[in-house]
Amino acid sequence: MTTLTTLPSIFVPLVGLVFPAIAMASLFLHVQKNKIF
């Protein structure tokens, strides 16, 4: 049962850091490819 309680404490910062990083990287690549700015 200890793994069930420790999983959220690992996934919350992981999702909070990795998801915005992937979103910003994909947005940056999208802008670089299309040369909007």
UniProtKB/Swiss-Prot annotation:
Pfam families: PSI_8 (PF00796). It is found in: Plastid, Chloroplast thylakoid membrane. The keyword Magnesium does not apply. GO terms for biological process: photosynthesis. GO terms for cellular component: chloroplast thylakoid membrane; photosystem I. It comes from the Eukaryota. InterPro entries: PSI_PsaI, PSI_PsaI_sf. Keywords: Chloroplast, Membrane, Photosynthesis, Photosystem I, Plastid, Thylakoid, Transmembrane, Transmembrane helix. It is a single-pass membrane protein. Its main location: plastid. The chain crosses the membrane at residues 9-29. PANTHER family: PHOTOSYSTEM I REACTION CENTER SUBUNIT VIII (PTHR35775:SF2), PTHR35775. May help in the organization of the PsaL subunit. This is Photosystem I reaction center subunit VIII. It comes from Cucumis sativus. The lineage of its organism: Eukaryota, Viridiplantae, Streptophyta, Embryophyta, Tracheophyta.
